[in-house]
């Protein structure tokens, strides 16, 4: 990753590790508990791009744990798709969804191979999709294999009045028992603000999304850059016992170790994600 390592450190901001609230555009707030780091949107987009991914511009930040033995990360995005109807959630067919995901991945593999990436083989559900209607939130997990590497993509959606938040976590399959509590905590700590909540929807004025929850689940699995591209860089290092956080330090332009060993002052993060204590 020479291009990443050569990135000037003065262009990079430190991780925000102070417990507080990360503002997710003008839509929602993420309460960041002790033990987590948050990287702003602009830095996250640059990091993803430098690691071979193609950011959509919807990235608001990246979350990881402060503990060095916690080798995972989560990317937070907001998609201004409109109000996503949840009426089909009660009749989900998980097997049919998985078939759709595998078919879409087979097609996407043609593009991956043309770009020099090995094909991705979807193994199946590690956690079938389930919808919390009261909270308007969805959780599911899929495992996939790339060469000898098996990874897990843990996906969550939080539905709002004008769109939805996607919180996408990547880790190795053996980490699954460790990932699940983080997913639950972080998802429960994100809430849309008043006027932007799912229950604030006004059918007379608000835009309705062109797709439903099933399409979002299938599309997120097939088209997620994290599932399809970042594993080629990150998960092999995790499997080899190397530290994900050290890779991120290099990727962010050689950030000094002091950023990980002392408590920085709160500051605004770029790209729509800010942290306040």
Identify the role of each PLM range.
Residues 18-31, 174-185:
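Short aromatic-glycine motifs in intrinsically disordered, low-complexity regions
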Residues 6, 116-200, 204:
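Short, well-structured beta-strand
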Residues 155, 186, 269-277:
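N-terminal leader-region detector that preferentially activates on the first domain or presequence
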Residues 30, 34, 95, 99, ...:
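Solvent-exposed, polar/charged alpha-helical surfaces in well-ordered, non-transmembrane soluble domains
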Residues 209-274:
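C-terminal single-pass membrane-anchor helix
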